[in-house]
Amino acid sequence: MATRNPPPQEYESDDDSYEVLDLTEYARRHHWWNRVFGHSSGPMVEKYSVATQIVMGGVSGWCAGFLFQKVGKLAATAVGGGFLLLQIASHSGYVQIDWKRVEKDVNKAKRQIKKRANKAAPEINNIIEEATEFVKQNIVISSGFVGGFLLGLAS
């Protein structure tokens, strides 16, 4: 049959007092990536051995390269398959393509992209400068990442 739970006062004792710690505020202020990559953290050379840096860069690069390869292969298959089906439908007479209109739309898109690229140039240059500075300060882990990325693409 069903058992009754004892009243709550039987569980409580004055000897057992616990302090509840709220770590959410600490976690908001102290992100792990600030310790690893933050401006005050200094270059990786000062923190980890060369072997550790190469392994960290190589493993993260391999993961990125492997994912890039798989996603790229999937995207290329989807785009190529869609284009192939469109060509088959066009040659079979199911679809009529107005190539002059396509060319006009492509040229319009090119002009819009050039306008937006000129406006976004300062932000992009700032990001490139920051990335270049990071690579200069952490050349060992960066070279490990590049090597791992290439291995990930090859696997």
UniProtKB/Swiss-Prot annotation:
Q: Which GO terms describe its biological process?
A: autophagy of mitochondrion; response to hypoxia
Where exactly are the transmembrane stretches of this chain?
48-68, 75-95, 134-154
Provide the topology term for how it sits in the membrane: Multi-pass membrane protein
Q: Residues on the Cytoplasmic side?
A: 1-47, 96-133
Q: Which InterPro entries match?
A: FUN14 (IPR007014)
Principal subcellular localization: mitochondrion
Q: What does this protein do?
A: Integral mitochondrial outer-membrane protein that mediates the formation of mitochondria-associated endoplasmic reticulum membranes (MAMs). In turn, mediates angiogenesis and neoangiogenesis through interference with intracellular Ca(2+) communication and regulation of the vascular endothelial growth factor receptor KDR/VEGFR2 expression at both mRNA and protein levels. Also acts as an activator of hypoxia-induced mitophagy, an important mechanism for mitochondrial quality and homeostasis, by interacting with and recruiting LC3 protein family to mitochondria.
Q: How does it assemble?
A: Interacts (via YXXL motif) with MAP1 LC3 family proteins MAP1LC3A, MAP1LC3B and GABARAP. Interacts with DNM1L/DPR1. Interacts with GPX4.
Its name, as the record gives it, is FUN14 domain-containing protein 1
* Organism from which the protein derives: Bos taurus
